[in-house]
Amino acid sequence: MTRSQKEEVVQYLTEEFKNAAAIVDCDYKGMSVSELESLRRIAKEKGLKVRVVKNTLAMIALRNNGVEDFQLKDTNVLIWGDDLVELAKTVTDFAKEHKENFQIKQGYFEGEVADASKIEAYSKLPSKEELLGMLLSVWTAPIRNLLYVWNAPKQNFVTVLENIRQQKES
């Protein structure tokens, strides 16, 4: 790789990391190319980005964004994206499927370095869509209850009329 290519990679990663909500560093030692491509495909479907990059170049890009505590050693694949819960879920699920060859090392979430256990904890949180559904349910509950109260007298009246009809028929 020439110096200018390295500078382009650092510039690209610096910009990407600046816009990312979270970054995860994973060890992929022993993974086949098809498994790594599978990770890339899954990540792309979820709006995440995956890149295997030299540690020194990634460290420069991270430091350009003020991330000092992030240490890269051995083989690393970096995964990043805008939705930290989706990122954590994707990486955790992939790590469970490929236990022998893929391990979560660390992450950078909300301005701090996170270990694998913290990333796994994030993966158990509800997704943005699930949270919106819960919020919508909370907002609509009072309206549903009000409609039920308004409809109750009508339903009771119909029930009383039905009972009277049945008594007269008997």
Curated annotation (Swiss-Prot):
UniProt GO cellular component terms: large ribosomal subunit
Pfam families: Ribosomal_L10
Any single biological process term in GO: translation
Stored InterPro entries: Ribosomal_uL10 (IPR001790), Ribosomal_uL10-like_sf (IPR043141), Ribosomal_uL10_bac (IPR022973), Ribosomal_uL10_bac_type (IPR047865), Ribosomal_uL10_CS_bac (IPR002363)
KW Endoplasmic reticulum (keyword) present: no
Keywords: Ribonucleoprotein, Ribosomal protein, RNA-binding, rRNA-binding
GO MF, one annotated term: structural constituent of ribosome
PROSITE patterns: RIBOSOMAL_L10
Function statement: Forms part of the ribosomal stalk, playing a central role in the interaction of the ribosome with GTP-bound translation factors.
Family listed: Belongs to the universal ribosomal protein uL10 family.
Oligomer and partners: Part of the ribosomal stalk of the 50S ribosomal subunit. The N-terminus interacts with L11 and the large rRNA to form the base of the stalk. The C-terminus forms an elongated spine to which L12 dimers bind in a sequential fashion forming a multimeric L10(L12)X complex.
NCBIfam families for this protein: PRK00099.1-1
Protein name: Large ribosomal subunit protein uL10
Originating species: Nitratiruptor sp. (strain SB155-2)
